[in-house]
């Protein structure tokens, strides 16, 4: 039998076996400190959940393609003397697509973060 097929069959079996052992042998004793938010071992005096500006998440999501660009271009840089003009054309096309995407992000103000965006603290969640 092929080694790959053995791994495909064996890995889920081992994973489920370890999960079953954990479920059967684990001790479940919840208490307030375990169920609460971690505050460096100190009891918090107010609500720990604050509103988070979604623009920061958007910047992180938009950062991913440009971060992956570096790992995609690294093999080309290492083999620049071995690839022909065809490889160079493919890399230029790849960079052109990324540049078009970046210009689109700038034109749609996707990277603009509103400085005056404050969370609504009038909600009952934020009161003691």
Curated annotation (Swiss-Prot):
Spans traversing the lipid bilayer:
4-24, 50-70, 86-106
Q: MF terms per GO, please?
A: NADH dehydrogenase (ubiquinone) activity
Identify the GO cellular component terms for this protein: mitochondrial membrane; respiratory chain complex I
Keyword DNA repair, does the record have it? no
Locate the coiled-coil region(s) and give their ranges: none
UniProt-listed Enzyme Commission number(s): 7.1.1.2
List the catalytic activities from the record: a ubiquinone + NADH + 5 H(+)(in) = a ubiquinol + NAD(+) + 4 H(+)(out)
User: Which membrane topology describes this protein?
Assistant: Multi-pass membrane protein
The record's subcellular locations are:
Mitochondrion membrane
| Organism domain of life | Eukaryota
Q: What is its main location?
A: mitochondrion
Q: Which UniProt keywords apply?
A: Electron transport, Membrane, Mitochondrion, NAD, Respiratory chain, Translocase, Transmembrane, Transmembrane helix, Transport, Ubiquinone
UniProt KW Transmembrane helix keyword: yes
On assembly, the entry states: Complex I is composed of 37 different subunits.
Stored PANTHER family: NADH-UBIQUINONE OXIDOREDUCTASE CHAIN 3
Family note: Belongs to the complex I subunit 3 family.
Functional description taken from the UniProt entry: Core subunit of the mitochondrial membrane respiratory chain NADH dehydrogenase (Complex I) that is believed to belong to the minimal assembly required for catalysis. Complex I functions in the transfer of electrons from NADH to the respiratory chain. The immediate electron acceptor for the enzyme is believed to be ubiquinone.
> What is the name listed in the Swiss-Prot or TrEMBL entry for this protein?
NADH-ubiquinone oxidoreductase chain 3
């Amino acid at each position: 039998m092929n080694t790959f097929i053995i791994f495909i069959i064996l890995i889920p079996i081992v994973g489920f076996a370890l999960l079953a052992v954990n479920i059967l042998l684990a001790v479940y004793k919840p208490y307030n400190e375990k169920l609460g938010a971690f505050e460096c071992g100190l009891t918090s005096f107010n609500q720990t959940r604050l509103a988070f500006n979604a623009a920061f998440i958007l910047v992180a999501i938009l950062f991913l393609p440009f971060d992956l660009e570096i790992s995609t271009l690294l093999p080309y840089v290492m083999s620049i003397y071995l690839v022909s003009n065809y490889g160079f054309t493919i890399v230029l096309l790849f960079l052109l697509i990324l540049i078009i995407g970046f210009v689109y992000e700038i034109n749609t103000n996707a990277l603009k973060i509103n400085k005056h965006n404050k969370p609504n603290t009038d909600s009952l969640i934020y009161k003691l």
